[in-house]
């Protein structure tokens, strides 16, 4: 992502969006926008707009954050070891904007790969299926057909 475009987008973020995506913060469980979303659509990076996750892969993990079994395209997320807070975890960041998204854990549904991408709502923008074309994401309509 172009630095000037990224800086422009960063200035448009709310405090919580900035804290989560740029300072690896975490929003409160069960008190965020998408933890219980049941509308069909895709989730894009709040900074770059790149598609990251689909509601088809979202499930209720009971943790209070949106949880997914996989990203739409693995090339759009970067995973690396996170040793903060006295834990060993795997951080998930967006590849294009280097935004902190959340963490991935090996305790997801076994029949869907066994992973749980636990993602902060503040790092995402949701595009419902009926708005995909209008928002320029028409290529992703096929996911829901």
UniProtKB/Swiss-Prot annotation:
Active site residues of this protein: 118 (nucleophile)
Top-level taxon: Bacteria
Signal peptide start and end residues: none
Gene Ontology process terms (BP): protein repair; response to oxidative stress
Gene Ontology molecular function: peptide-methionine (R)-S-oxide reductase activity
A GO CC term attached to the entry: cytoplasm
Alphabetical UniProt keywords: Oxidoreductase
Enzyme class name: oxidoreductase
Reaction(s) catalysed by this chain's protein: L-methionyl-[protein] + [thioredoxin]-disulfide + H2O = L-methionyl-(R)-S-oxide-[protein] + [thioredoxin]-dithiol
EC number: 1.8.4.12
Domain MsrB residues, every copy: 6-129
UniProt record similarity statement: Belongs to the MsrB Met sulfoxide reductase family.
Protein name per UniProt: Peptide methionine sulfoxide reductase MsrB
Natural source organism: Listeria monocytogenes serovar 1/2a (strain ATCC BAA-679 / EGD-e)
Gene name for this UniProt entry: msrB
